[in-house]
């Protein structure tokens, strides 16, 4: 235990997926947390706010006394039992608060009184967060190769197959387009960046890394934006472009957005509620780009989408969706991506069908 008490190699802690018993208030945890952390607060949001106000008006001693009055008796015991259960479940875990200050020390002392000696993170979440930021900046300096291509080209699958591939969309829980959301809500910006940093550290530790393989992304993936240090490096990176037949792209999109998403929604919510959520998901994706489509074209495609959904509901066929997906690709997504790719034409080092790009990557 003495070694663990002193062990503050933050990178090693992140690499090991070290369980963190994060005792910050829920609002702090939601704003940013490390992968693998569980939130078991010493004080809830309202309690923390009251203590903070007291600190400003009456000083540290009065604030500490108020905190002990707010977290006492049954409340204290309930929270103590939760921390004990977490430590029993994760005996290699660490306590963590914002800066390694009073909150984690108080919880540590209360646990010690029950016979549990749980170490804490010196410097707290802030120290781990700074380590994550520094790691991303350092590892982003390695060479990068981008995988480009129009929507439905199988870029994400190609990235996932590479031992040095980083699935940015998977980390962001979003596939990048207006239809890109998944059933899992996106993380906060800080939590996304922390998760990305840990992924980079893990991949880098597994192998002698020549370069990263990433999907050619914009500045944002849904609500998350890429760290600027990584985005700057990606803007200069060589690109391998997947150019598959249009029909093959349509089949990939059918599988991903109409078959799999319908399955995921109904599996999560049941047939009726799942169908409603799936329908709203497709409508929301189209609505998000209504201004770029023009309101008349948006209305036309919405009518076509409604007919396609009715057909899918009655027969299970997804063929009707092609009547709005094809023009959406031809009129919006493909021209937009090709315009963006033209601006980076000098960076293109290879282009060809999916399998040719996969073989080219393997030969590098």
Curated annotation (Swiss-Prot):
Biological process terms in GO annotation: tRNA wobble uridine modification
Enzyme superclass (EC): transferase
Annotated EC: 2.9.1.3
Domain Rhodanese: 14-137
Superkingdom as given in the UniProt entry: Bacteria
Keyword Lipid biosynthesis (UniProt): no
InterPro entries to which the protein is assigned, alphabetical: Rhodanese-like_dom (IPR001763), Rhodanese-like_dom_sf (IPR036873), SelU (IPR017582)
Function: Involved in the post-transcriptional modification of the uridine at the wobble position (U34) of tRNA(Lys), tRNA(Glu) and tRNA(Gln). Catalyzes the conversion of 2-thiouridine (S2U-RNA) to 2-selenouridine (Se2U-RNA). Acts in a two-step process involving geranylation of 2-thiouridine (S2U) to S-geranyl-2-thiouridine (geS2U) and subsequent selenation of the latter derivative to 2-selenouridine (Se2U) in the tRNA chain.
Complex and partners: Monomer.
Family the entry assigns: Belongs to the SelU family.
Name of the protein: tRNA 2-selenouridine synthase
Classification of source organism: Bacteria, Pseudomonadati, Pseudomonadota, Gammaproteobacteria, Enterobacterales
